[in-house]
Amino acid sequence: MNKEICGEDENKKSDKLINRYILRGRKFVDYACFQYGAYNAAISGEADANFIDDYQYFVFTKSTKSLETIRILLRNDKTEDALIVLRSMFEGYLASRFIGEKYDRKLLDDFIFFPQIIASNKTYYNKQNKKHYLKSNNEALNYKQRNPAEMIIGKDKSYYRALYDYLCMFSHCNYAILPHYLDENGFFDCDGKMDCFMVKILVLFIYTKIFESIVTVEGEDFFNIREESECYKLVKDATMY
């Protein structure tokens, strides 16, 4: 790892924060993440707002697993590839916040039920009117797939465009990032060229937002007071960092 670029002391601090997030994130998944919406629907026969928890816990679990992957990539100087994974994490944060703050029953169809139906190959797509239809009875699904720009809320608008465009450059084959795949002599090279410390800052920024919006929210259950204190302290330390 290029310590001259990263700054060894700051690099260690950021590593410790990432490690702490993985530890607390995994614990939260184990003791708190449960499909409350699906459980209640199985009993009552109706879908309700508890599915918001299901979706947000899904995003949190997926993001925590992605954080572990990013840690492995960064340890192996695959910084550009870490940004590819980070883009998916950022999209998850936007969707999770959107469904939580803009909830209505229709969003459950768009975010949870219709995607499952479509993925199970129970529909066909009409290119002319751009709609999905059930194969069983030709009924149209009133499905809206939102792009990330449609789910920005509040202060996220102030930085979304710059951050998302930057992440997209690395997840697409954008020729603007060519220098990251060349050595000092202009030959193609698979070794990392990016400032790994900058990438870690972006990782901490995005995962902190996910952790803060799902874990350290009013009414969330912790299995003991110490765990609650550690989670709030972690968010504070990462934010101040």
Model-predicted regions and their roles:
Residues 1-92, 96-241:
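A cross-kingdom marker of C-terminal helix-rich interaction/assembly modules
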